[in-house]
């Protein structure tokens, strides 16, 4: 127990979208807001970038530890265009909005320890198999050929500039 009860170095969390709750009549959490009218991912999840501002802010205030996004991203219907490239503008927009909110948290003093995109490459997902694409790099499942999507180039630029272009 002594070994596994050491203090945490940081708090990490996978975050994809916000869920707003309120106390129900029995005191248990009840979903309070439906995100009708919000943009959605290919699997119907609402696009709520402000969650990358409020979640790190809340968690740092509560736990006093640096905060890390251990997974954030979206499913999209991606394909290789006639130019041989993958133009996943929805994912670029998603990342710009979410990383912009994350940057705002840093500017407001939240100690951010990192961000990991979901996922580097299109892959097998337990809930969706190969039917959805989550990666920054397109995977041709028949040939295993990889093609950088526009979102990969966008994220590369974010990393190179430490988010200055957000």
Question: What do these predicted regions represent?
Answer:
Residues 1-166:
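Non-catalytic scaffold segments within catalytic domains of secreted glycoside hydrolases
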